[in-house]
A protein has these predicted regions:
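Two-metal-ion RNase H-like nuclease active-site motif
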Residues: 41
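Charged, amphipathic alpha-helical segments and their flanking helix caps
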Residues: 1-36, 45-147
Length: 147
């Protein structure tokens, strides 16, 4: 299996196993109130290290790529303490992802798993919706012959 796909599948498994999460889905942005709190994992983007091309490496040579999936935490009805509830689930997700040995193994010795930040709807003039995007970066060596 492709490493990108394996990483994304593992992220959904991790999200589904978190205490307090009713549902974990992939690439779905419509999740009913009854299935929340939930985490939706979005595949998002991937970029190759451009330095390899500048060094004259052929296109089939191994290359480090960075994928940037997003975990969208969705709460149910607006809780009175939406900020603390989102932060609690963010902390659980970040800890679970950064300490997961399977993800570390998938990234490999030359790769890495990194928390890249979060974004919310909480702010002056915003919707105050109970959702938070949690961003990760996974770097791994792409070996075309292993795809």
């Amino acid at each position: 299996m492709d490493k990108r796909e394996a990483i994304l599948q593992r992220l959904v498994e991790i999200a589904a196993g978190l205490p307090g999460i009713a549902a974990a889905v992939r690439n779905q942005d419509e999740i009913s109130e009854h299935a929340r709190p939930a985490i939706a994992v979005f595949d998002a983007d991937e970029t190759a290290d451009e330095r390899a091309e500048q060094q004259g490496h052929p296109g089939r040579a191994p290359n480090i790529v960075e994928m940037t999936p997003e975990g969208l935490i969705l709460l149910g009805a607006k809780p009175e303490h939406v900020g603390p509830a989102l932060n609690e689930l963010r902390a659980k997700l970040v800890k679970a992802v950064l300490t997961d040995t399977q993800l570390s193994t998938l990234a490999g010795a030359n790769g890495r798993v990194r928390y890249a930040g979060c974004s919310t709807h909480l702010g002056h003039g915003r919707s105050m919706e109970g959702s938070m995007g949690v961003h990760f970066t996974f770097a791994y060596v792409l070996r075309p012959e292993q795809i």
